[in-house]
Every structure is written in C-alpha cells, then in structure tokens.
Swiss-Prot record:
Disulfide bonds: none annotated. Signal peptide: none annotated. InterPro entries: DNA-dir_RNA_pol_omega, Pol_omega/Rpo6/RPB6, RPB6/omega-like_sf. Promotes RNA polymerase assembly. Latches the N- and C-terminal regions of the beta' subunit thereby facilitating its interaction with the beta and alpha subunits. It comes from Oenococcus oeni (strain ATCC BAA-331 / PSU-1). The keyword Aminoacyl-tRNA synthetase does not apply. This is DNA-directed RNA polymerase subunit omega.
C-alpha cells in the first residue's frame, strides 16, 4: 500500500485535474463534517418544550440544508478524517463533479 490511500494517481483516473480533485474533495469533506453537527442541532431544537418562532425558522432552515447533503456513501472507511473519507468516496466513484456546475465553471 502506498503512503497515501488512495493515491493521487488513482484519484486522477476519476477526476481530470488536480485542481478539480482538491475542490471536490474539500467540498465533500465539509459536507461529511457538517452532517452530524446539523443533525445534532436539529434534534436539540426539536426537543424544546415551547419552541419560539426563531426556533421554528431555524428548524426549517436546518431541515432544508439536510435535504441537500448526502450521508456517507461507503460502509467502511480506512481513514478517520473527513478529507481522507472524501478521497475514498471519490476513488470508489461515489462522488463526482456535478455536470451542471461543471459547465457553468468552464464558461
């Protein structure tokens, strides 16, 4: 096994440039970090006995954010860090650049 798993060479077979690889991995790692925090915050707000209008608005906002996030896509990870997990998901082909956003960025 190489020093880094997955290797950059393996990853570049999935994404056509180092820049895109870094952008995709960092975005996915942020999502993986954000998901548990948002879930905890939502549960905390829902446990309030008398939620205020502000609490209700926050619940709606968090629920909307959670709808856009995808949870972990692999059953087992070798890495414990979000960036390593993101790279593993990219290598498995579970995370790809959104073609709609890709077209916009190339204009």
């Amino acid at each position: 096994m190489s020093l880094m798993y997955p290797s950059v060479d393996e990853l570049l077979n999935k994404v056509d440039s180092r820049y895109k690889l870094i952008a995709l991995a960092s975005k996915r790692a942020k999502e993986l970090e954000e998901l548990p925090r948002l879930k905890d915050e939502l549960l905390k707000l829902k446990r309030e006995e008398k939620p205020t209008d502000r609490d209700k608005k926050q619940i709606q906002e968090i629920a909307a954010q959670l709808e856009t996030l995808v949870g972990p896509t692999l059953d087992n990870y070798k890495s414990v860090k979000p960036i390593g997990r993101a790279l593993e998901e990219i290598n498995a082909g579970n995370v790809q650049i959104d073609p709609v956003n890709k077209d916009k960025s190339e204009d």
